[in-house]
Regions:
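Surface-exposed, active-site-proximal loop segments in enzymatic domains
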Residues: 45-46, 148, 255-258
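Auxiliary Fe-S-binding modules of radical SAM enzymes
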Residues: 1-9, 184-317
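Short aromatic-enriched loop/helix-cap "lid" or pocket-rim segments at secondary-structure transitions
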Residues: 35-37, 126, 253-256
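Generic alpha-helical secondary structure signal
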Residues: 39-41, 93, 137, 291
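N-terminal [4Fe-4S]-dependent radical SAM core
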Residues: 1-76
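Conserved AdoMet/S-adenosylmethionine-binding subsite of the radical SAM
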Residues: 60-240, 244, 249
């Protein structure tokens, strides 16, 4: 395997939402997730990709050289996403290289945004409140039962425990992407915020969650309905959330004006708490239809400040 020269790259697609740059530390991954897109991206067979995980040759040296050159050009304080097409903590492997990579990034004043199904708690001492440590929970019920898990990584319970530990030192997040079991994910969203006598931060397992649909594979989940339900759960427990573009697209233009009016009144009791009864609300929605799309959000935010913004996109005009 040739030494890696410039391991940092600008991430494409949804990955660009996770960092200014991305970095893949390992070649291969033993976790064998059935929905993994990495083999297709890398154009290797699934058998080959899942058969091993080994550090890319010269990854630390290549990273240090690239960071030095970028610093000379004025690039500092950026965030590196670890890792789009591998896991930074592959189970059953020596992950000391991951620690070296984080140490290298920190020496040059960079921050990290980690996403794993493995155990990164051993590197918690390297992280601070400018960093993000995240885990993937796909909602598969098997992920919560170590005895029935059919693919690798920690169980859901073990991943939650790692979040609790690292949350004392850094920001934590959960990626519910792709969602395999909608109801399981909705229950898990509520578990991300737990009552605590020590205050709000101590009550949270995750500071933010990312929610995304299963792409490029069949699913019987009603994505528009699930997206609305997930937004409502996050709003009800005060959980900061982000919906990926592909799921947001499924939610867009999926409700008639009348359905939206009925939905808002059922969920927020708008008529009981304001003068905005059903007819006035329906009229306001009709009025918004005549506004430019970029002005609708500001209009709705002023009219219904308690409603999650993403729900306004669901109206079909």
């Amino acid at each position: 395997m040739k030494p890696v020269k410039n391991p940092l790259y600008v991430p494409p697609g949804n990955a660009k939402e996770c960092g200014d740059y991305a970095l893949d530390i390992y070649a291969g991954c033993p976790h064998n997730c059935p929905y993994c897109y990495a083999p297709d991206v890398l154009r290797v067979s699934r058998e080959e990709f899942f058969s091993h995980a080994e550090p890319r040759t010269g990854i630390v040296e290549g990273l240090e050289k690239q960071l030095r050159e970028m610093r000379e050009k004025g690039a500092s304080g950026k965030t590196a996403y670890l890792c789009p097409v591998c896991d930074p903590y592959p189970q059953g492997c020596d992950t000391s290289v991951t620690r070296e990579v984080i140490q290298c990034l920190k020496r040059y004043g960079w921050h990290v945004r980690i996403l794993t199904k493995g155990d990164g708690a051993r590197d918690a001492d390297l992280l601070d409140m400018d960093d993000w440590y995240g885990v993937t929970l796909d909602g598969n019920r098997e992920q919560w039962d170590r005895e029935t898990m059919t693919y690798g990584g920690l169980s859901g319970e073990e991943l939650f425990e790692s979040l609790k530990l690292i949350h004392k030192r850094a920001n934590t997040w959960v990626s519910f992407e792709p969602v395999l079991d909608a109801q399981m994910v909705l229950r898990t969203l509520r578990a991300c915020v737990q009552p605590s006598p020590l205050g709000e931060r101590h009550s949270r397992v995750a500071d933010k969650v990312r929610i995304g649909k299963l792409d490029f594979q069949p699913s019987d989940i009603d994505w528009a309905k699930f997206g609305r339900a997930a937004a409502l759960v996050c709003d009800s427990v005060g959980l900061d959330f982000y919906v990926t573009d592909s799921l947001r697209a499924q939610m867009r233009d999926c409700m008639s004006r009348a359905e939206f009016t009925e939905f808002i009144h059922a969920k927020w009791n708008v008529g009981d708490n304001s003068t905005l009864g059903p007819q006035l609300l329906d009229g306001a929605v009709a009025y918004a239809g005549g506004l430019k799309p970029e002005n609708r959000l500001a209009f709705f935010k002023e009219m219904l400040p308690s409603v999650p913004e993403i729900l306004f996109e669901s109206i079909r005009y």
